């Protein structure tokens, strides 16, 4: 729930209290029939992972599944609790008590989308130290660049992460001891993928859009993308800003995938978030490269199996919009599925 200033951050956390991101009271009684993508139990949709034990860690306090503050923060006569580290650790303890994952699990995929992507990366080393099986990480839509918004003249996400740390991390560091050591006085940096990925010891797979419309709006102040996911309404200055940001994401993904065992799937398509758990998982409209047959599902499976040829699981689009044509002018129906 981080925002550009501390007051806005508190307000955002407060607003989350009455949503499923802030309280289990608003969660459905069952997720049966609600899960898609890599979480689906349908073998036709999820042929390689549908028979796995799938556990969902719902969000609680808006601090990326980490941080701890013993005393609540009072805001608008309401107590806000920031205890993501203890909550996540207790979930791991519960999994071990119920499934004996510390000794029985041979393969574990720790995956997350958006803030959950950073949460998965932060906890990966800790989880691997606790279990005998092999831990792998999938980070979906978690690559946000530390840049200055030209409209506000402020680095939005840097400000937001500093505020999160002020609220939740005065008493503890992040779950990633290696990143804490790397940035002892600026631990907020560990909430950025660009600073975190190299400290993760496990094999990781990164899923992201090279044209993340929400990032453009928040980081760049660009709000020209139309309802069909095109840049047709953007002027030359806006397109140049978008392409500059996209180049930064490409460079970062290329660095991350240069590490042995790491993979990626990043199309030159305009979309946003949760690509692992939406119809985009197997949708042939979304392939990287275009018409290559490499959907997210196929690329992730090749990475998981450890195929020898990296070109089968390292797919960062080399073109710009709209040159991955099938996903550059999607229909209204497809668009509604992508943004649900």
Which role does the model predict for each range below?
Residues 1-340:
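C-terminal His-loop and adjacent cap/lid subdomain of alpha/beta-hydrolase
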């Amino acid at each position: 729930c981080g925002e550009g200033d501390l007051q806005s951050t508190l307000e955002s956390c407060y607003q989350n209290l009455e949503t499923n991101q802030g309280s289990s009271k608003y969660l459905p009684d069952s997720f049966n029939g609600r899960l898609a993508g890599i979480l689906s139990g349908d073998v036709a949709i999820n042929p390689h992972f549908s028979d796995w034990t799938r556990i969902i860690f719902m969000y609680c306090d808006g601090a990326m599944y980490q941080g701890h503050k013993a005393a609540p923060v009072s805001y608008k006569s309401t107590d806000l609790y920031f205890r993501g580290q203890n909550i996540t650790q207790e979930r791991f303890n519960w999994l071990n008590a119920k499934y004996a994952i510390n000794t029985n699990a041979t393969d574990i995929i720790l995956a997350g989308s958006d803030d959950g992507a950073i949460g998965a990366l932060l906890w990966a080393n800790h989880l691997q130290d606790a279990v005998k099986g092999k831990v792998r990480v999938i980070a979906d839509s978690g690559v946000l660049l530390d840049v200055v918004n030209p409209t506000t003249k402020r680095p939005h996400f840097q400000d937001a992460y500093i505020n999160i740390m002020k609220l939740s991390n005065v008493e503890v560091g992040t779950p990633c001891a290696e990143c804490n050591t790397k940035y002892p006085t600026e631990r907020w940096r560990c909430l950025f993928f660009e600073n975190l990925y190299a400290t993760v010891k496990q094999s990781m797979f990164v899923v992201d859009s090279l044209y993340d419309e929400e990032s453009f709006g928040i980081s760049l102040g660009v709000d020209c993308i139309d309802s069909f996911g095109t840049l047709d309404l953007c002027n030359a200055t806006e397109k140049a800003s978008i392409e500059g940001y996209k180049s930064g994401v490409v460079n970062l993904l290329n660095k991350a995938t240069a590490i042995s065992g790491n993979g990626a799937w990043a199309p030159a398509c305009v979309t946003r978030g949760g690509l692992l758990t939406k119809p985009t998982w197997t949708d042939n409209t979304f392939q990287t490269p275009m018409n290559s047959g490499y959907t997210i599902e196929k690329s992730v499976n090749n990475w998981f199996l450890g195929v020898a040829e990296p070109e089968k699981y390292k797919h960062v689009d080399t073109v710009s919009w709209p040159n991955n044509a099938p996903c550059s002018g999607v229909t209204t129906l497809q668009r509604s599925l992508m943004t649900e």
